[in-house]
UniProtKB/Swiss-Prot annotation:
Family matches, as PANTHER family: RIBONUCLEASE H2 SUBUNIT B (PTHR13383:SF11)
Residues that bear Phosphoserine: S292
Annotated protein name in UniProt: Ribonuclease H2 subunit B
Subcellular location as annotated: Nucleus
Modified residues (N6-acetyllysine): K291
Gene symbol of the encoding locus: Rnaseh2b
Amino acid sequence: MAGGRDRGDLAARQLVFLLPEYLKDASRKSKSGLLFVKLVNPHSGEGATYLIDACLQKLFEIKVFKEKHHSWFINQSVQSGGLLHFATPMDPLFLLLHYLIKAGKEGKYQPLDQVVVDDKFPDCTLLLRFPELEKSLRHVTEEKEVNSKKYYKYSTEKTLKWLEKKVNQTVAALKANHVNVGARVQSSAYFSGVQVSRDKEEDYVRYAHGLISDYIPKELSDDLSKLLKLPEPPASLPNPPAKKLKLADEPVEAKEDYTKFNTKDLKNGKKNSKMTAAQKALAKVDKSGMKSIDAFFGAKNKKTGKI
């Protein structure tokens, strides 16, 4: 676990990160070893913070765990908020897809340095420095080489096949780690809580598809769902019909007279009610000289006087 400072805050707000050991080593070796950059989120198109290991040339996404009323004790200070940040490895090709899809609408081959351009997120050019980038681009683009320079054009067909492999790899990882996905798929599909689902192959594929969809645009997610032949989630099972209330302008009248059960009647009881054998025996007991139970709990008279 490591701590950092948010330089954008005048109060030098400290952040708590959970990092792999090799990332901590990289930060010690070089001040520029770890770079926090703002890049486009491939799913929403909004800006998001990512971590780049300049030494190992790896990309990490930042996940935040948040709970209310939590704080951190950091050395001799207290940091409010209690946020816990996680850095998890991420395939940079997901971020490049955003620019490849956008350029692909022009329908022509272009050099990569003309595709990955963003005035809003200028650090996107750092994605071009990752090793084996050209090898990865073959999964999602058509490629041409002219005068020793390579040109690329986005391919939907190749991308869907690549994403299908990602889904299959995710399914295998879920099974290997014995992750129960049945209940989670039920919850996300708004199934009835009464319906119990077992971990079927379809549940694994649907859950893996949902995980991958967090890194791609919705339109591409829908195309991937069709490729995987995922059926539409069934509608939620209806609850048993309740008695319908008649809605009208007039006030609803009670069908019974509930005033007959008031406290006075409950205290006195019905005069004509039959007594049990125990009640009859108690009635024959001589109660003369007995104090009421209220006498033991009544307030005592206090003596008052002037001083």
